[in-house]
Amino acid sequence: MRVQPSVKKICRNCKIIRRNRVVRVICTDPRHKQKQG
């Protein structure tokens, strides 16, 4: 899980979702998981 000031999609399986005001990227590749905040 990477915590970054700006999150981006890395591949086409990445999805950007918002949970409790936290922007997250979920993906089939665990290395692509990101969180903003």
Swiss-Prot record:
A Gene Ontology term for the protein's cellular component: cytoplasm
Keyword Ribonucleoprotein: yes
Gene Ontology BP annotations: translation
Keyword set, alphabetical order: Ribonucleoprotein, Ribosomal protein
Database matches in InterPro entries: Ribosomal_bL36, Ribosomal_bL36_sp
Keyword Cell membrane: no
Pfam family, any one: Ribosomal_L36
Position of the signal peptide: none
Gene Ontology terms for molecular function: structural constituent of ribosome
Organism superkingdom: Bacteria
Family: Belongs to the bacterial ribosomal protein bL36 family.
Name of this protein: Large ribosomal subunit protein bL36
